[in-house]
Amino acid sequence: MLNFIIKTHRKDTIYTKPHLFVLNKGMNSGKPQKTPFTNSFVIIFQNEEDCESLFFIAYSLWQTKFWHQHLVGSVISFLRLPDFKKQFNPQASLMMVEHEQHQKNVAALKLLEK
């Protein structure tokens, strides 16, 4: 199980542990990036491998517009921190399990091919 902390990013805060930022305002809410956005959440990890793998999971969730259903606001839509926390962990876990199962299936097919 991945261990990470999600909180609101504050300007001029320096993070020593591996981290990534996720935009929380506008129609691009959920977009991950290594550098901070003005309006963003920060996800802090214990190690670099978890950070890297979850970056791509967050990126795929953003590309599939997963976060659009959780946006609120009439003029400038935004993503609430509790909604993000509630949805991100289960989605990340599900996608990690599916990826591991896919890797096992590919390995089994390669063995059958020999």
Segments (PLM) and residue ranges:
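A short beta-sheet element
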Residues: 24-64, 68-73
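Amphipathic alpha-helical coiled-coil/heptad-repeat segments
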Residues: 92-114
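Loop/turn positions that initiate beta-strands
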Residues: 17-19
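A short acidic, often aromatic-flanked loop/helix-cap motif at beta-alpha or helix-coil junctions
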Residues: 11-12, 51, 95-97
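A short, structural micro-pattern
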Residues: 15, 35-37, 81
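A short glycine-rich beta-alpha junction/loop motif
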Residues: 75-100
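Sequence-specific dsDNA recognition surfaces
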Residues: 1-15
